[in-house]
């Protein structure tokens, strides 16, 4: 069951699906239970897979192919014996924002290919450049067969500048109105454009 089952007493033969992070899976295997690792940060394929402004509306989040491929489902904190209790990984897709089968294909491919390699490849044998080349080829092949994958060859990628805060030079400066604001719509008077709530 979902990792919430750890909160109410877990059945002796239960397997835990760790979706809220890795903590549930770690707790499960350290207490002798099996776990399936499916944390949202790496395995929820209903998140945006490219720059959100370039994608169909999604539930939120940003999960590009490279991040899926980088996932290691066996946390480093586990012993070799505990690691044997990790059954593997699972990809998830909630369809509130995915109205058609074609859109499902778009959201899962090629990220599901990356998740498959995460499942069957030892981390030390993985190569992102090699996989990326193969994923480009796989996307072209899927398209030829009539599927609707995300076109990896047109990936925009993350926008690092969007992750940096911007502090503009006008903040806190005196504002001089060239035309007085209307007395019928005074808002916050002279502070309406400088209080950080109403505008710049």
Regions found by a protein language model. Name each.
Residues 1-165, 175:
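Substrate-binding groove of N-acetylhexosamine-processing glycoside hydrolases
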Residues 162-200:
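Disordered, acidic Ser/Thr/Pro-rich linker "stalks" and the adjacent N-terminal cap
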């Amino acid at each position: 069951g979902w990792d919430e089952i750890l909160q109410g007493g877990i059945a002796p033969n239960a397997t835990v699906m760790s979706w809220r992070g890795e903590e549930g899976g770690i707790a499960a295997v350290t207490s002798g239970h099996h776990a399936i690792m499916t944390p949202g940060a790496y395995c929820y394929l209903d998140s945006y897979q490219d720059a959100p402004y370039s994608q169909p509306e999604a539930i939120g989040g940003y999960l590009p192919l490279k991040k899926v491929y980088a996932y290691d489902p066996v946390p480093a904190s586990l012993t070799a014996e505990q690691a044997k209790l990790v059954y593997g990984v699972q990809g998830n897709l909630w369809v509130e924002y995915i109205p058609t089968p074609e859109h499902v294909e778009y959201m899962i491919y090629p990220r599901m290919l990356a998740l498959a390699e995460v499942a069957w490849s030892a981390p030390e044998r993985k190569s992102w450049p090699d996989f990326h080349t193969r994923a480009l080829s796989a996307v072209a092949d899927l398209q030829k067969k009539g599927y609707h994958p995300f076109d990896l060859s047109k990936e925009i990628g993350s926008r690092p500048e969007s992750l940096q805060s911007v502090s503009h030079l006008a903040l806190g400066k005196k504002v001089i109105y060239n035309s007085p604001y209307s007395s019928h719509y005074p808002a916050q008077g002279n502070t309406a454009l400088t209080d950080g709530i109403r505008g710049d």
